[in-house]
Regions:
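Active-site environment of divalent metal-dependent phosphoester hydrolases
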Residues: 149-152, 202-204, 232-240, 300-303, ...
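Extended active-site neighborhood of metal-dependent phosphoesterases/phosphodiesterases
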Residues: 97, 211-316, 393, 398, ...
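Metal-dependent catalytic neighborhoods of phosphoester/phosphodiester hydrolases
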Residues: 197-217, 237-257, 344-352, 380-389
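Non-catalytic terminal accessory segments
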Residues: 2-69, 73-132, 437-544
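His/acidic metal-ligating clusters that form di-metal
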Residues: 187-193, 291-293, 305-398
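Acidic/histidine-rich helix-loop elements
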Residues: 147-178, 204, 244, 301-310, ...
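N-terminal active-site segment of His-dependent metallophosphoesterases
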Residues: 86-110, 114-116, 120-206
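Active-site-proximal beta-strand elements of phosphoester/diester hydrolases
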Residues: 137-150, 289-300, 335, 398-403, ...
Length: 544
């Protein structure tokens, strides 16, 4: 009888320890505000404008769907007297739920970053594909700097074309058509997700946001999940405008992150098991073994800033998820709008994160292989070297800067994982011509997009540069500006450049002889030095 009592007591003790472990893990991932230890409402909470009812550092707390509350209580009332959140689901239960909702995604596995060994749970029968199909790791399609402009925002008149002529080569006149072609391509390729890394509208116009959301909803309804984060153009942008007649006019724009969330909550936010209370950052599970860490790097609380920064609270939040992902053998991919590294000799300000040092250190402390961004309007691939002389074979976080979709060659990225945790990335050009033929377009520019569009971009840039050159005959101006425009196009696209053919041109010789100290002369050198190789393919090193 005494032995039976001891056995019962032992069972209770084991049960208590298991429950305590689950509560501890959920407490790490759940409703505690990073760095405070206090429970906060789990929501798409974002800093409000300074002109609102909240002061600096204060945040609003919109209501959220239950689907976003898997890791936090979602309610202040759920906090118990001893500070423990009343959680109903364990982390393991969430993983199981992901597999049930995504049965084709297969089992959880992969290498622990920095550990170099398989996750012990990869052979757990509970995580195996219920359909007994061979597991295929996910593939995502990435688009940055979409700068969508609805045709309802302009009349194709004087004000509109002045904007196009003063811009950086965007084909805004075809924005609707390019979105149609992109949607058609997405549904043909059927990636695990379509990811938009910011600057999704021209200048944050509310109407452009709403029209874009409708288009994204159609893609998602057709079976491809859409995942979105903002860029610096998307929130609190007073350059928001319509273009009718001879002059542009101010247009309504989004004033806060909360308004962005209200429009786009169904594109990644609602599917997230955990959102950062201090920004629009969130975790998006592509499947149970692969997470996108969607980071809000934009500064829109007090007006609109071009430069980016990851909030300190967000870095703390990010660190928790990096640790948990490492412990569970989950592959992570951080994505933001602003650049992690110094990527350009030509664009040296307001591109790299203001707190890049802290962010790089955090990512590298968990051996994160890759970070993806946009913003620069030029494709770049670079690996961080902690100090000069570091071997090329040594670990360092790599960054891929996506080319701007809004500027020809209208490129997007395809990133895929393999079963060992490796990654492959490459850019592809949107096949505008094929889609134009498919829908019966009679527009010669669209039917010959691959040959017409480079000339369009170069023509825009050439005209802008020519206006800055004085005391030089027009034919020589055209020679000089034409060379710069040619290099600019290749720079944006990430196409290989070299000195030898450039130095042989009449245009370069004129720059050197007539305007050796001109900013464009310097930029020619900077562009060539930045892009010495084609920047369209990246593979994760096997050692990582």
């Amino acid at each position: 009888m005494r032995l039976k009592k001891y056995l019962h007591l032992l069972c209770y003790l084991v049960l208590i320890l298991v429950c305590a472990g689950v509560v501890y893990l959920l407490g790490e991932l759940g409703g505690s505000h990073p760095g405070t230890g206090k429970e906060t409402e789990h929501s798409a909470q974002t800093p409000e404008e300074s002109t609102g009812g909240t002061g600096a550092g204060e945040t609003s707390q919109p209501e959220t769907d239950e689907s976003s509350d898997r890791f936090s209580d979602g309610s202040e009332d759920s906090e118990t007297e001893n500070g423990e959140a009343g959680q109903e689901e364990s982390y393991e239960a969430w993983l199981s739920d992901v597999l049930k909702r995504n049965p084709q995604k297969g089992s959880i596995g992969g290498k622990k970053r920095g550990a170099g060994k398989k996750n012990d749970r990869s052979d757990d029968s509970e995580t195996k594909n219920e359909n007994s199909e061979e597991y295929v790791p996910p593939t995502i399609m990435i688009v940055s700097d979409l700068h969508y402009m609805s045709g309802t925002m302009h009349d194709d008149g004087t004000a509109f074309w002045k904007m196009v002529a003063d811009d950086d080569g965007k084909t805004s006149q075809y924005s609707d058509f390019l979105m149609d072609a992109l949607a058609d391509t997405v549904l043909e390729k059927k990636p695990s997700a379509l990811v938009l890394t910011g600057d999704i509208t021209l200048n944050g116009e509310r109407e452009n946001h709403e029209k874009l959301a409708k288009r994204l909803r159609a893609i998602q309804d057709a079976g491809v999940p859409v995942v979105v984060i903002p860029g610096n153009h998307d929130i609190s942008n007073k350059n928001s405008a319509t273009y009718f007649g001879k002059e542009k006019e101010e247009a309504e724009y989004l004033h806060s992150g909360e308004e962005f969330y209200e429009i786009y909550h169904e594109f990644g936010f609602d599917q997230s098991p955990n959102r950062d209370p201090s920004s629009l950052s969130y975790v998006y599970p592509v499947d149970a073994g692969h997470w996108l860490l969607m980071l809000d790097s934009c500064q829109y609380e007090n007006g609109n800033k071009v430069g980016g920064r990851i909030r300190p609270e967000t870095l703390t939040w990010l660190g928790v998820h990096l640790r948990v992902a490492q412990e569970h053998g989950i592959e992570v991919l951080p994505m933001a709008h602003h650049n992690l590294l110094s990527e350009s000799r030509m664009y040296t300000s307001e591109c790299t994160l203001e707190n890049t040092y802290d962010t790089v250190n955090l990512l590298e402390s968990y051996h994160v292989p890759l970070y993806i961004s946009g913003h620069l309007h030029a494709e770049r691939i670079k690996k961080h070297k902690p100090e000069p002389g570091t071997s090329a074979d040594d670990y360092g976080v790599s960054e891929i800067v996506m080319p701007p979709f809004s500027i020809p060659a209208c490129q997007y990225g395809i990133l895929s994982w393999d079963t060992e945790g490796g990654m492959h990335f490459e850019t592809e050009k949107l096949d505008v011509e094929s889609y134009a033929k498919k829908v019966g377009s009679t527009d010669e520019h669209l039917l010959n997009f691959s040959t017409w569009s480079p000339g369009f971009v170069k023509g825009i840039i050439k005209n802008q540069v020519m206006k800055t050159i004085t005391l030089v005959p027009d034919d020589l101006k055209a020679e000089m500006a034409g060379l710069y425009a040619d290099l600019y196009y290749d720079y944006c696209c990430g196409n290989k450049m070299s000195w030898e053919p450039v130095r042989a041109t009449a245009g370069y010789k004129l720059w050197q002889r007539v305007l050796p100290d001109n900013v464009y002369t310097k930029r020619i050198a900077q562009m060539i030095e930045d892009v010495r190789d084609d920047l369209h393919i990246w593979d994760s090193p096997a050692s990582q």
